[in-house]
């Protein structure tokens, strides 16, 4: 009897499908995938090919999911129903899809309608991934909705209204590896809530309301995101033989007062504790009785045994450590000595007044060190330290007088940012410079140097000799005197030169010799002329804004025609006539000149015009008018002289005749 009923249903289904083939199918089918997203559909289409394996219905207006017509597509493996208005799931609707592996129900209304009264999702034996994010699920609604899914590996319950996780919340899904719970309001996680997930490796609990992590015992976990909570303490209470696999831990934007307990995580390679309230103590606790004393600044500190072998130290494998945006005033040497594998260290935006790395082979693998936005007054680096350091960020501190070879001792340094300090460079061997200056010559690895805003008064000759810089920023040093030969040695390497806002009236730099220079910024100075580029160079961008240029003669700019792509000229008293080279660039479009409609030039002594509107004949007419005026003035002057001479002669003759008559 049952076979006859199934046969009848199959015949009815086939007949219905055939009869509806004449209707226009709104979806596009490619390789057994039906693409129906964003079509404004009110129900699941019933006229699709019966052998489709993927059905994408996101971004429609579906409210109910019924066995018919969804049950027609028994070969479905991937079903996307996200971003609809679904509030009703007919009982057994997904059981009609025996091969279903991926189900996306994100951003619907499963918590507001009858979806939960139908028995939830039911048993889905082959389901691998399930997305229920953004459905306002709360309380025990999740438990009622979730069914038995023995093969489920990825589950998302993000962006819901969960406040608590119970021990039995995740029963029936023992294979889950990735669990996303971000953006809920979780305040409590019952002990053993994750015991039903023995294979869990990735757990996202970010953007919740958790205040404390205690008795952490998820040994198999590899990635844990606890960012954007209100966590004040992170502690573990592992079993004696526990072997934790945690490699990635994110605790940023919490309320941690102390460095977290990491003693049980020997495989940790990434740690982010930025945006907390962390302070590091001046030294390590001395007695074993103080090893777990938060009042000393250590929270079950992993650093409390300095005699431990570095290779077995819990932080010895750490590659990335972010401590930015905290309240750290001092980094003790004992904190750094075991970070033997660390490659990236961010200590920016703290309260550091000094930083020391004196111990030989300290931080041997560090590639990037960010100490920017502190109040650093002292930087002491010993010899043979930071041997792999390539990038050092020191901008916006209070550095003033440093040992002269502070940076020359860094064997691999490539990028150095000193913007916003008070550092003065020494000169070359012939001009060593004043006390407290820093030597930037003879650093063969350094390529990028930023010394903007350092209140430098003098840049001496040979300041960067034998240092192959490609980028040099000397901007915002008002009153800077660039001595002749200050940039000598950079002619073959320099590609970017920034000299903006220095008040320069004369530029004693032979720019045409810098054959690889691609970007030159001379804005906001008082320059009125440039050296002549008579041969082809590589300059692509030239910024001359807010200077005193009136003319850019072709004999000086001709060498730039093959390379120059962009020219900035606003804020200069340009002359409308005599700028034939510039006018040619505007009209021919060979160079992109900024704001050509607003680029104003002076025509004569008073009249101002848009440079793009000036034509050569305008200047010729202006020239003829000037010639005519000069001729008229000359004729008038000559006439006046002749008349004056004649009048004088007549007067003298009359006077002579008068004297003769009297005689």
From Swiss-Prot:
Protein name: Transforming growth factor beta activator LRRC32
Keywords of this entry: Cell membrane, Disulfide bond, Glycoprotein, Growth factor binding, Leucine-rich repeat, Membrane, Repeat, Signal, Transmembrane, Transmembrane helix
Keyword Disulfide bond appears in the UniProt entry: yes
LRR repeats: 49-72, 73-96, 98-123, 125-148, 149-172, 174-196, 197-220, 222-241, 243-267, 269-287, 315-338, 340-362, 363-386, 387-409, 411-433, 443-466, 468-489, 491-514, 515-539, 541-559, 561-584
Organism the protein comes from: Mus musculus (Mouse)
Subunit and interaction comment: Interacts with TGFB1; associates via disulfide bonds with the Latency-associated peptide chain (LAP) regulatory chain of TGFB1, leading to regulate activation of TGF-beta-1. Interacts with TGFB2. Interacts with TGFB3; associates via disulfide bonds with the Latency-associated peptide chain (LAP) regulatory chain of TGFB3, leading to regulate activation of TGF-beta-3. Interacts with LAPTM4B; decreases TGFB1 production in regulatory T-cells.
Gene name linked to the record: Lrrc32
Ranges in the topological domain labelled Extracellular: 18-628
Domain LRRNT: 22-49
Taxonomy of the source species: Eukaryota, Metazoa, Chordata, Craniata, Vertebrata
